Amino acid sequence: RTFSSAASDVYKRQSQYDDAVKIAKAAAEATVVGYPNEDGTKIGPISNITKYEKVKRLIDLGVEEGAKLVTGGSELPDGFEKGFFVKPTIFSDVTNDMTIAREEIFGPVLSILKYETEDEAVEIANDTPYGLAGYVQSGNPERAKQVANKIRAGQISINGGRSRGPSAPFGGFKTSGNGREHGMLGLHECLETKAIIGN
């Protein structure tokens, strides 16, 4: 499940869970936070104070609700005394009833949830009021397509596919909005249709 079109939740089988947490932790800790004009920066500041305060509040709420803070947190990254910068943050031991698994965060925060069966993963993915985008990763492309078809989101990327061509529509399901941008569907969203009826 994603908010904006960046992943905010990752679902891993119980048998792969610990390895996934270690990989995510290493990736987050290697990610450089800084000013966009500086070489090496991978994540810049949050766009405004309202969004920044929301991200910090949700990180703190994740801890309060019992998720394990693997790395990151709501304090400024090392080397920053001001600005809307957020450390890349990873949570494990997240359950789908926690706020960080259910809300749009729009910040560098990743929650890792466990599942046992494919059907359970789909159920978790769909148990949200949002549905903008999602991702499916699998060594079996046909199976990945089957899972993608079960997820209620406006865009599903399979095996890292991130590039939408100009003809591919983009937009969400549920409270992530209706209507589409891009492609013919996006063009039709900008048109006004008129019917003229005469004898």
PLM features: what roles do these ranges have?
Residues 1-7, 11:
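Single conserved hydrophobic/aromatic residue that forms the stacking wall/gate
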Residues 9, 45, 134-136:
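Short cationic amphipathic helices and targeting signals
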Residues 78, 82-199:
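Conserved C-terminal structural/oligomerization subdomain of aldehyde/semialdehyde dehydrogenase
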Residues 1, 45-49, 181:
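Charge-dense, low-complexity intrinsically disordered segments
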Residues 14-129:
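NAD(P)-dependent aldehyde/semialdehyde dehydrogenase
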Residues 6-7, 67, 125, 144:
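Small-residue (primarily alanine) positions within well-ordered alpha-helices
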